[in-house]
């Protein structure tokens, strides 16, 4: 155990990285999970808050992903799976609004590339100085695209001042532009980008040094190559040593990297081995040293009715706590509950760090009072799909949220009805999804998103 932190030390100990000065961002980003972002009849999504604006608060542009809700061949909603990172859902684009207001003009940033073709977009992040936006794109995709075949996921960057869009890694100089997949980019304070990738640069270099054939390690399910964390320069190069950038080593996926105020990288790791199958939070220095479990290895039985949940999409809030999404792997309509984790004092929900041994927990609390269920079926409080803490001193969170609705199949044609207690007691209530994107105040756990404008799916 790490004596200072009371965490499990999983790597070579080094001097902890100091937090570089982080510039105030002039741009805030919301990555709206596409499957939960409802489109209106006109194809638009409302991002708004009906509360009066605070004259002391500066409003910033927002970027978000918008796509159609994916359907199976039988017309039912297709369920995502946290363990599958390579699959794509066509019909997505990256959009910009000058403010989080229904009157703000919506601009399609990626239309210059997608041009109506079948592309997918995800994992949006902004640079610390608020001048650039980075995200993952895949396309153009065939109607019955084999996820194992190219085109693959690539990382793109949008420069706001010049209104230019480009692939961060130049395909012409990429040694393997067709089969490797790069997702989940996040800016480091020095301008470099940490991302999840199937490149496995150092792993394959070790195989080469040992005289063994180079191959991409598959995850334990053998469904797709393992995604691990690597770091590249701002221009998409990897420096003189092409094997240096690999930050993490895992037999399954490392995803959703972000940077803490102390300069360390925090991410969600899929630990999958005999007798173990969970996604917990890990951290390390930006060079991969001093790897440690950050939170949650023994806190997965904290879902609805003490069911299993995974911890994904961690982001640090201005007060130092961690905002994360807890949800099951699949069959939960692409969403779950937002929780706030006190990672500064706890390593598990009821286990404090060594320096805080008198604390009893809980370490994690719901971000809102919504009655959100993390099990399959209707959720009275709706479900959250993604969240972005606004670093503007207002303690707000921009979220992608789907309201609880039911499909009454006793009517002809079937009708959408509210999730009332009576309707929920009906035999086999069927959820119908509706999404809202809005800013929520968590000062007193009273979500302002209840008054947001909503768009029907």
Please tell me what each predicted stretch does.
Residues 65-89, 136-154, 195-225, 267-280, ...:
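Short, conserved, GDST-rich strand-edge loop motifs in beta-rich repeat architectures
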């Amino acid at each position: 155990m790490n004596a200072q932190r009371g965490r499990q030390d999983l790597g070579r100990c080094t001097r902890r990285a100091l937090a570089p000065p982080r510039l105030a961002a002039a741009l805030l980003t919301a990555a709206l999970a596409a499957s939960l972002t409802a489109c209106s009849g006109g194809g638009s999504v409302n991002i708004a808050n009906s509360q009066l604006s605070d004259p002391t608060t500066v409003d910033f542009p927002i970027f978000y992903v918008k796509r159609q809700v994916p359907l199976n061949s039988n017309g039912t909603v297709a369920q995502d799976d946290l363990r599958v990172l390579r699959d794509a859902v066509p019909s997505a684009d990256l959009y910009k609004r000058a403010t989080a207001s229904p009157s703000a003009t919506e601009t399609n940033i990626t239309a210059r590339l997608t041009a109506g073709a079948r592309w997918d977009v995800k994992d949006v992040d902004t640079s610390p100085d608020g001048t650039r936006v980075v995200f993952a794109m895949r396309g153009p995709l065939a109607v019955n695209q084999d996820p194992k075949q190219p085109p693959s996921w690539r990382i793109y960057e949008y420069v706001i001042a010049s209104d230019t869009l480009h692939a961060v890694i130049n395909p012409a100089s990429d040694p393997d532009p067709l089969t490797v997949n790069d997702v989940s980019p996040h800016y480091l304070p020095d301008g470099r980008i940490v991302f999840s990738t199937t490149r496995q640069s150092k792993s394959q270099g070790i195989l080469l040094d040992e005289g063994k054939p180079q191959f991409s390690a598959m995850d334990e399910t053998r469904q797709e190559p393992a995604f691990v964390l690597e770091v590249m320069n701002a221009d998409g190069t990897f420096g003189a040593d092409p094997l240096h950038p690999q930050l993490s080593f895992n037999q399954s996926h490392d995803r959703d990297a972000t940077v803490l105020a102390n300069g360390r990288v925090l991410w969600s790791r899929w630990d999958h081995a005999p007798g173990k199958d969970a996604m917990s939070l890990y951290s390390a220095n930006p060079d991969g040293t001093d790897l440690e479990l950050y939170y949650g290895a023994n806190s997965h039985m904290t879902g609805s009715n003490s069911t299993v949940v995974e911890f994904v999409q961690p982001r640090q809030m201005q007060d130092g706590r961690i905002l994360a999404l807890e949800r099951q792997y699949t069959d939960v309509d692409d969403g779950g509950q937002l929780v706030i984790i006190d990672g500064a004092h706890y390593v598990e929900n009821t286990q404090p760090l060594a320096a805080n041994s008198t604390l009893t927990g809980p370490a994690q609390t719901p971000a809102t009072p919504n009655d959100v269920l993390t099990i399959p079926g209707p959720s009275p409080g709706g479900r959250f799909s993604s969240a972005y803490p606004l670093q503007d001193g207002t303690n707000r969170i921009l979220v992608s949220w789907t309201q609880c609705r039911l499909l009454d199949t006793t009517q002809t044609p079937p009708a959408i009805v509210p999730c009332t207690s009576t309707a929920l007691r009906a035999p086999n209530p069927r959820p119908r999804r509706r999404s809202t994107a809005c800013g929520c105040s968590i000062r007193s756990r009273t979500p302002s998103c209840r008054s947001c404008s909503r768009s029907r799916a």
